[in-house]
Curated annotation (Swiss-Prot):
This is SsrA-binding protein. The lineage of its organism: Bacteria, Pseudomonadati, Pseudomonadota, Betaproteobacteria, Burkholderiales. Pfam families: SmpB. It comes from Bordetella parapertussis (strain 12822 / ATCC BAA-587 / NCTC 13253). GO terms for cellular component: cytosol. One of its GO terms (biological process) is trans-translation. Keywords: Cytoplasm, RNA-binding. HAMAP family: SmpB.
């Protein structure tokens, strides 16, 4: 079950490989995420010291959060992957033009997982081409739907 999607990711990047990772979270973060108080829009994934981290994910603390801790809404969160996957990702990210983009948060066996992808940034003309292609598909579906209704009525 998906918690939140980063819809802007597919608009801004060509998605090549998808990965799923666990995250190191604190208790108050898990409660807030389960309550839907999370945003992925400005977040990104980086490689630092041979490990992979998620930066910029905003988790708004619940008003009932404990008073003895100071929740940091945008703290850096470590992603949990196998060493082989990390090595493979580091090799790909070091190539020119590749980046790691968070796609969505979801539950898997009661745990919160992050789907992220290896992607290349789209240029403005690529975004226009994608939009044009979507419009064409939508128009084609509309015409076919309308055409089949007319044919059924005539029969």
């Amino acid at each position: 079950m998906s918690i939140i999607d980063n819809r802007k990711a597919t608009h801004d990047y060509f998605i090549e490989d998808r990965y799923e990772a666990g995250m190191v979270l604190e208790g108050w973060e898990v409660k807030a995420i389960r309550d839907g108080r999370v945003h992925l829009k400005e977040s990104y994934v980086i490689v630092r010291d041979g490990e992979i981290y998620l930066l910029g994910m905003h988790v708004s603390p619940l008003p009932t959060a404990s008073t003895h801790i100071r929740p940091d809404a945008t703290r850096t969160r470590k992603l949990l992957l196998k060493a082989e996957e990390i090595r493979k990702l580091i090799g790909k990210v070091e190539q020119r033009g590749y980046t790691l983009v968070p796609l969505n948060l979801h539950y898997k066996n009661g745990r919160i997982k992050l789907d992220f992808a290896l992607g290349r940034g789209k240029k403005l003309y690529d975004k226009r081409d994608t939009a044009r292609e979507k419009d064409w598909q939508r128009e084609k579906e509309r015409v076919l739907k309308h055409d089949t209704r007319v044919n059924q009525r005539d029969s």
